[in-house]
Amino acid sequence: MKCPVCHQGEMVSGIKDIPYTFRGRKTVLKGIHGLYCVHCEESIMNKEESDAFMAQVKAFRASVNAETVAPEFIVKVRKKLSLTQKEASEIFGGGVNAFSRYEKGNAQPHPSTIKLLRVLDKHPELLNEIR
């Protein structure tokens, strides 16, 4: 079968590891079955192959999303804890202007900071334990 994209190469059944990037994070999706063009490397997958591919994509995206947080959430938790941006930066680290950058969406906190913010959102009384 000729490639439907480049019309030059033949489509050959194979298994490949596919590089994948989401929100600046990179991974390699392992063992992706499909038909691959020997010329342009385009791929065609049947439903089963596509479902397996998408399962890996969704799992990676979920792991990346678990490490990121919306700026609005950071503002909400900081205010819930009655902290200024400066106080929050002193407690959680990241530099003197860290929370300003996080709340504007210009930077993401370290994953450990995100986890701690999530815990404090549910249990604000624990703030005194980390001060």
Curated annotation (Swiss-Prot):
Function: Antitoxin component of a type II toxin-antitoxin (TA) system. Labile antitoxin that binds to the MqsR mRNA interferase toxin and neutralizes its endoribonuclease activity. Overexpression prevents MqsR-mediated cessation of cell growth and inhibition of cell proliferation. Initially reported to act as a cotranscription factor with MqsA. Following further experiments, the MqsR-MqsA complex does not bind DNA and all reported data are actually due to a small fraction of free MqsA alone binding DNA.
Residues holding Zn(2+): C3, C6, C37, C40
UniProt cross-references to CDD domains, sorted A to Z: HTH_XRE, MqsA
InterPro entries: Cro/C1-type_HTH (IPR001387), HTH-type_reg/antitoxin (IPR052359), Lambda_DNA-bd_dom_sf (IPR010982), MqsA (IPR022452), MqsA/HigA-2 (IPR032758), Znf_MqsA-type (IPR022453)
A single GO cellular-component term on record: toxin-antitoxin complex
Temperature dependence, free-text field: The MqsR-MqsA complex is exceptionally thermostable with a Tm of 83.4 degress Celsius versus 48.1 degress Celsius for MqsR and 61.1 degress Celsius for MqsA.
Changes after translation: Degraded in the presence of oxidative stress, maybe by the Lon and/or ClpX proteases.
Domain HTH cro/C1-type: start-end pairs: 74-127
Record keyword Oxidoreductase present: no
Matching SUPFAM superfamilies: lambda repressor-like DNA-binding domains
Note on cofactor: Binds 1 Zn(2+) ion per subunit.
PROSITE patterns: HTH_CROC1
Swiss-Prot/TrEMBL keywords: DNA-binding, Metal-binding, Repressor, Stress response, Toxin-antitoxin system, Transcription, Transcription regulation, Zinc
Name by which UniProt lists this protein: Antitoxin MqsA
Subunit and partners: Homodimer. Crystallizes as a heterotetramer with MqsA, MqsR-MqsA(2)-MqsR. Purifies as a probable heterohexamer of 2 MqsR dimers and 1 MqsA dimer. Binds promoter DNA as a dimer. When the 2 dissociate the MsqR mRNA interferase becomes active.
Recorded superkingdom: Bacteria
GO terms, biological process: regulation of DNA-templated transcription; single-species biofilm formation
Result, substituting R101A: 10-fold reduction in DNA-binding
GO molecular function terms attached to this record: metal ion binding; protein homodimerization activity; sequence-specific DNA binding
